[in-house]
Amino acid sequence: METIFAQSSAFGKAGVAVFRISGPKSLEVLQLLTGRKDFKSRLMYYQQITVPETKELIDNVMVVYFKSPGSFTGEDVVEIHTHGSKAISIMLTNALLNIAGIRLAEAGEFTKRAFLNNKFDLTAAEGIADLINAETIMQHKQAIRQASGKLEALYNNWRSQLLKMLSLLEAYIDFPDEDIPDTVLNEVTNTHTILVNTISEYLNDNRKGELLRSGLKLAIIGPPNVGKSSLLNFLMQRDIAIVSNIAGTTRDIIEGHLDIGGYPIILQDTAGIREESSDIIEQEGIKRAINSAKTADIKIIMFDAEKLDSSINEDIINLIDENTITIINKIDLIEASKIFSIENKYKCLRVSVKNNIALSSILKNIENIAENMAGFTETPYITNQRHRNYLQQALSHLTAFSLDNDLVLATEDIRMTARCIGAITGVINVEEILGEIFKNFCIGK
C-alpha cells in the first residue's frame, strides 16, 4: 500500500494548517522532516521541520504519530500542525512530493482506506462526508448519527435476520435426512413477514432524511409586484433580488440558502404570475415560476391587499397544498375588513414586508412545515438515494419470496435480499451463511 499525504485543513491564511500522512512510510517521512528517530504513538511533539535535501527550515510545528491500527485509517498515520500560511503549505507539500514512495492523496482516499481497513462501513463513511458538508444544526445531528454507526446497526440487524433465514433454508435443503424440525419453515415465514412490513414502513418515510440532507426548496409565488423580492431580501437579510415598482422585474428564478430553526432552506424568488403577458421573456419566467412551485417542498403564496381580485388567479390557487403558507402583503395600505373573507378562506397571514409587520410569523410557519417534513427523530432515516435504491431492490426480492414456490428459488430471493442490504453497508460475503449453519445446527446429530 502506498503512503499518501494531503493538507486536511483549508488552504490559505489560518491559525493552524493540518497535514495528514497515512501508510507504511509515515513514520519514516516524519523522521526525515524532523531529524528525530524516537516518536511514541499518540504523543504530541514540538519540532522543527526542514526540507530533507537542503535542511531549509519550513516551520516550527506540532506533530503526532499514530501507530497502526490505532488511527483513523487503520494504517500508520502522522499529523503535522503548521502555522496556517500559504507559503508554509506550499513548501511542505513540495518537500513531501520529493520524498520517494509518497504521493498526494486522491479525494476521499483517507476515508476510503479507513473503510477498507474495517474502521467503519459505507454508511458511516457517507455520514462523515455529510458531516463535513453540514450547514445547519439538524443536518449535523443527522450526519453525526449516521457517522457514529446508527444506520449500520439498523441495516446489520436486518441482514443478520436474513442470514439466519438463509441458514435455516440452506440446512433444510442440503440436509434433508437430518432431524430438522418442521418449525424451521414457520420461523422463516414469521421473520419474512416482519421484515417485509418493517422495510416497507421504513421506505414510506416521505424522504425526510434526503430532504434534510439536500435542503428543502421553498418557492415564493404570487402576481407581479406583490413584494416577493422584498420578502426574499428580508429572509436572506441582504439584497439579492432587485426590488422595483415595475411589474415583471424578476424574469428568472433567484435562489438563496437559509437556515431556519436548524433546517436548510433553499429559497427561490420567481417571476410574477399573471394571466396575460405580451412579453415573451416574461412568459417564460411565468412558466418557470409555476414549474418551480410544483417541485417546491414548501410554498409561500403572496396576495396583494390592494389588488386582491387580480392577485387571486386560477394558476396560483391551484398551487395551494398542506405545505403552503399564504400571506396577504401590504396590509398597512388597506382596512382589515376588506380582506377578512379572503384571509379566512385561504388561512392567510396578514403582513407588511415593507414595514416589517408580522414577518416573524412567516419564519415560524416555515420552521413548523420544515420540522413536519424533515424533523429529526430517534429512528435513523434513509439519507441517500443509493440506500433507497438498494432497499427497494431488497424489498422486491423479499416480496417475491414464497415457500409455495420452489424452495431453491425461494432461498435465492432471500440471498439476493441479503446482498442488497449488504451493498448498503459495503459488506457482501455469502460465506457467512456457512458459519450460520454450523452455529445453529449440529449436523450429523
From Swiss-Prot:
CDD domains, per the entry: trmE (cd04164), TrmE_N (cd14858)
EC number: 3.6.-.-
Residues reported to bind GTP: 225-230, 244-250, 269-272
PANTHER family with a match to the protein in the record: TRNA MODIFICATION GTPASE GTPBP3 (PTHR42714), TRNA MODIFICATION GTPASE GTPBP3, MITOCHONDRIAL (PTHR42714:SF2)
Record function comment: Exhibits a very high intrinsic GTPase hydrolysis rate. Involved in the addition of a carboxymethylaminomethyl (cmnm) group at the wobble position (U34) of certain tRNAs, forming tRNA-cmnm(5)s(2)U34.
Family designation: Belongs to the TRAFAC class TrmE-Era-EngA-EngB-Septin-like GTPase superfamily. TrmE GTPase family.
Subunit-level organization: Homodimer. Heterotetramer of two MnmE and two MnmG subunits.
Pfam families found in the cross-reference section: MMR_HSR1 (PF01926), MnmE_helical (PF12631), TrmE_N (PF10396)
Residues involved in (6S)-5-formyl-5,6,7,8-tetrahydrofolate binding: R20, E79, K119, K445
Domain TrmE-type G: 215-371
Localization terms from the record: Cytoplasm
Protein name: tRNA modification GTPase MnmE
Presence of the UniProt keyword GTP-binding in the record: yes
An individual GO BP term: tRNA methylation
Keyword tRNA processing among record annotations: yes
Cofactor remark from the record: Binds 1 potassium ion per subunit.
